[in-house]
Structure formats: C-alpha cells, structure tokens
C-alpha cells in the first residue's frame, strides 16, 4: 500500500501550488509529455482520446448544420497575410516564418499558419460568383502555430490542435445568426459533454478578434478562480471579403461582398477539464468525454472463475459503454489509485463473493460512492450511473462558479475582491476603453465578456463613476 500512497503523494496539493498541481496531473494521468521543442507537447493516448471525443461531437454537429471538411496548406505567403491590416497586426508577434527551403533562401517568406482566414479567402475568391454559390460552410481540423512567450501544456502551446470554421453568407443577418448558432453549439459541447458551465457573451472591442466586427465567446471559471476562454465565434462582416476581393452577383444582378464568420475550439478544452473538475487525487473525467468510461477490476483474480466472469462482464458492457478490463497482476489497491488518478468515471469491482451473489460493486470517481448492482441489470445500471455522474459534476461545477462570482460597484470593491476572492467579478462599464485599460493596469483583470443575459448591478461604471452601459464579467485569465 506504500506504493499506492506514493502514487497520489506525487501530486502537489492544488491549494499549495495550483500551477504545479496542474502540471503533475498532465504528466501523472499521462495526458501529455514535453517535447524537445519549447512550447510544444506530445499528446499521449489518454489526452488524444479526449480530443477525439470532442472531435466526434463537434464534427457530427457541423455536418448536421451542412458544413464540409477541407484541408488548407500549412504555409501562408507573406503577401497574402498582409492583405488584411488589422488581422496581420493582431498576429504578427506570434508568427513563425520559414525563410529557407533546404539551403536556398526563399524569394518570399512563408508564415506557418497561426490561423487560416487568408487561405480560405483566397480560395473563396476563386469559387464564388453568384448568390447561388452561397453560403459556403467549410471547416478544417488541423494544428496551428503561434510563437508564445509563456507556455503551459494544453492551455498555451506553440503548436496546438483545433477546428477552425470559415463560412461566407449572402447577408449580414444570416452570417450573424450562423455565428451565434455555432456559439450555442460550443456551449452545449461544454455543458452536455464536458460538464462545464459557461457564460455566453460578446467581447468588447478591445478583446475581439483581430479584423472582426464582433466576437462572441464562452467563458469558464477554473478551480483557482481564473477565467478561461473556452471557445469563440466571430462575425467578420465584409472586411476580409473586401480585402480579398470576394464578390458575388446578388439577386438583383449587382456585385456585393459576402459576410464572413469564423470560429474555433482547441485542445485547451482538455486543460479546462483538468482545472474545472480535478482534485488532489488526480484527474476527474466527465463520462461522456472520457476515452474509457468504466474500468473493471477483478478482486482475488487468482481464484477460480473470477477472471472468466470479469471477461464476460467486459464483453457485455462493451456493447453500451467504453470499458476496459485490467487483468494485470498488480494489486487491486494500486489499480484503484491509478484509475482514480487517470480520472476514469466509474470503477467496477468483482470478486468471488460478488460472483456468488450475482452482483458487482460500482465506485464513482467523482464522489467515491459505492453501489451494489445485480449482474442481470448491470448494462442499464452502468449507463444510468454515468448519466448521474455527469449531472452531478455539472452541478458541482456550477455551484463552484456561482460561489466564486462576485459583484463590485466601485474600484475599491473591485480591487479588494480580485486580490482576496479570485473569480468572476460582475461590474458595470461605461463603454470607454480607457476604463477597461485602467482596470487591467490596476488589477490585472480583463473584460471576459458582456453576457447575453444582462442585469443591472449599479447605475454607474465601476471605474469612472459615469453612467453605465453594460454589465461585464471581469477576471484574471489564462
């Protein structure tokens, strides 16, 4: 049992050092490993399996909405990147450049894509002539590169995986509606699959995507009270269409520019799962996103009939859930600690006495509750238990978020709250960027979003005291 204890002792308590706790879980749960390239990571099977399940959900939804997957080049010529001024200025500090092919210097530098708007625009300009060609609903799954100064696995890496959607539409109304439709899908992904509550809203002009008219966001709150942007959807207006001369003949035969949307979620969602649900024993995976939803642990497996029954149970459960049987010769206690660390939502124990009674023991990862169930109805009981676990994890995360959401009506309250009670701060704002800049300068907090569900917590701006225009969620963020 000393080994079992050591297994968990290797995790730094989150209250002692949250950043180290996070890193310990990434490594101990075998989600990712560091590579020899600064800021790049090796996503291991446990981590990639989570991403695959995110992919399945998002890809299925996008295809239901009529999107098609494509693949764009990884390189962008410098002249192409320069076409949209605000866009290139927003990404210039993070761009990685290719200057040589073999020993030969290239005639023009190639950017390793930080995002692909320019490539999609170049393509759309070639294939769109008429309103009958619209809308174009494209998506791609790929990796992108942004030369970050400070990196952390999943949360901020030089290279990361994502999906990026790029659509063009006949009208502003259609494009804006589509942008919000995608944001709603991202919200459902977080709540229905990741058991992670989010606040939906619109970014301020200061925080919106480079080159966008409007940026919509879903914001989540981590255990340590920091915010994390979990997904964004942007309405780019006609800015990119005009920059890249994408034109179509409208219903009256006149030339017009299509309205553009772009949106993405990334592997940083895996980091969010860790920081919303994890505890000092390791990872806690929401059942619907977990690569392995249940693990069967035979107890006293050397005794006659135990392994055979465990294998029979696995075969039965594999038809309804993602299940693993651990029939290794490690002690059951070691296995319990290992799978608790790795966040497997449900442990199923079966031993000689259980077989005699035609039962198995279900142990929940989220709260360690044990339930005895009959083997005759174990398929339905396991599925029911996984749904119960998901709902319980979502409610617990909502409770934590709500407990760490505060109201401030002046800067004194704001500063005191951000220093002593980390979390979301709801405060009114006049709409002046100078106030937004001052809040960041003084407190380190940024505007996370202007929530769609507006409320009035004060009549005046938290910073300057002038008449307020919007409620804003503020917070320090990843």
UniProtKB/Swiss-Prot annotation:
Coiled-coil annotated residue ranges, if any: none
Top-level taxon of origin: Bacteria
GO BP terms: prolyl-tRNA aminoacylation
Record's GO cellular component terms: aminoacyl-tRNA synthetase multienzyme complex; cytoplasm
Recorded GO MF terms: ATP binding; catalytic activity, acting on a protein; proline-tRNA ligase activity; transferase activity
Keyword set includes Nucleotide-binding: yes
NCBIfam families: proS_fam_I (TIGR00408)
Subunit relationships: Homodimer.
UniProt comment concerning the protein's domains: Consists of three domains: the N-terminal catalytic domain, the anticodon-binding domain and the C-terminal extension.
Biological role: Catalyzes the attachment of proline to tRNA(Pro) in a two-step reaction: proline is first activated by ATP to form Pro-AMP and then transferred to the acceptor end of tRNA(Pro).
Descriptive protein name: Proline--tRNA ligase
